[in-house]
Amino acid sequence: QHNPFVILADKDTTESTGECYSASFLYSGGFHAQAEVDQFNQTRLVIGIDDYDFSWKLKKGESFSTPEVCLTYSADGFSKLSQTLHQAIVSNLIRSCWKDRVRPILVNNWEATYFDFNKDNLIAIAKEAAELNLDMLVLDDGWFGKRDDDFSGLGDWFVNEKKLCGTLSELVKEVHDMGLSFGLWFEPEMISEDSDLYRAHPDWALVIPGRQPIRSRSQLVLDMSRDCLLYTSDAADDS
């Protein structure tokens, strides 16, 4: 849950003055960051894959490439550090069509409706968004499976047409006709135990045998090294 990022700075560094260094681990899994001052008053900074529960066995002739770390320095405070890092990421890491485009201003229905929505109140939100000259409506959690609360349905990525009072395509068309783009929420890395997917593939959940699993928002984490990755990708395409 923590951002794999650290800053080392002089105690007097501010947003606009002073020296600071940052290390941004370009990896989304478990990580370990450590700073140590030795007997010569030199600071040693380490950041990488968390070695507590990680191991990787290499066979003869194989290799393992560790994730990269982006190192940044500023002599003009934290703001300059942030700007330099942002520019580096935009120029070298972002690969999608959004790399050099201004992001759309959007409205997300979640805080307005949570799970309790239908086509009519989604269209009402979209109309207000269009009147305010926003760019996009994003349909959040609850559009799929049996998903009226956070105890069930996550992982069943098929459209709940009863809830939407029709097909997803029909809803999207109405939103597009207002001049808005349409976005759809996914949480592909999680699963509800009360779901068709879990009942079919309980082994896809990331749990330690013989131990009580850790749940967050009544959900388990999927083991993305399994076929669930292909399943979720196919389901997203179908939706």
Where are these regions (language model features)?
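Hydrophobic positions within alpha-helical membrane elements
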Residues: 66-67, 145, 239
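A generic structural signal for short, solvent-exposed coil/turn residues
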Residues: 15, 25, 37-41, 48-50, ...
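Aromatic-lined carbohydrate-binding/catalytic grooves of carbohydrate-active enzymes
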Residues: 100-230
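Intrinsic disorder/low-complexity signal
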Residues: 9, 139, 236-237
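Generic short alpha-helical hydrophobic face used as a protein-protein interaction/packing hotspot
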Residues: 65, 111, 179, 236-237
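N-terminal accessory beta-strand-rich subdomains and adjacent acidic, glycine-rich linkers
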Residues: 1-89
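Long, charged amphipathic helices and adjacent flexible linkers at domain junctions
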Residues: 89-98
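Single conserved hydrophobic/aromatic residue that forms the stacking wall/gate
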Residues: 231-239
